């Protein structure tokens, strides 16, 4: 089985912890996006990114220094959002690192899809960006079915730990031979079970580590996940939707 996760907006450079092992599968398409971004004026980039002045200035500097072939960081270390902090890949055993290189995939608006040890550089390009002036009106259209085709080349089951924005790279291309199981983390709020974004990101990171450390091959094994006191809920789940619920007090964590 393959596991998909979303990238993070915050990126960092780390060339010391682990070596780069591979190149991104869709690097030729990434070069097209790089060329487009570098052809935009500062005002056009501001409109494209919809970011604060500080973030825009940082992103423009990143773009000026961008080199897709040199001084790269392994993708699993390049993203530093909540999910990646709780995943803590720098603490993985070697078997767990080998497992994620084979089975974990990071979806990306800029790179399409990444293996953990593909070499990347910092970028700013959300998947839902309106691509004014580009050859395609949206990145969903630009990437089309390529991500799904690659994902299901070796496996018929994908574990979805990505956000709704990124799972749209895969979901439209499912069929009777392609199965995707979405993982949902819920907690009780005002007598209703709800997904709290920050806590879900924490749990997704912990679950990736749980899967990797235990070298899981069968989706049913995921039901044994109990971090943050989450319990698999059979009554709320279905064949393609695993729901985990908790009464854990995140405020005290």
From Swiss-Prot:
GO BP, sorted A to Z: response to hydroperoxide
InterPro entries attached to this UniProt entry: YaaA
GO CC term (a single one): cytosol
Origin: domain of life: Bacteria
Intrachain S-S bonds: none
Pfam families: H2O2_YaaD
Family affiliation: Belongs to the UPF0246 family.
Record-linked HAMAP family: UPF0246
Name by which UniProt lists this protein: UPF0246 protein lhv_1883
Originating organism: Lactobacillus helveticus (strain DPC 4571)
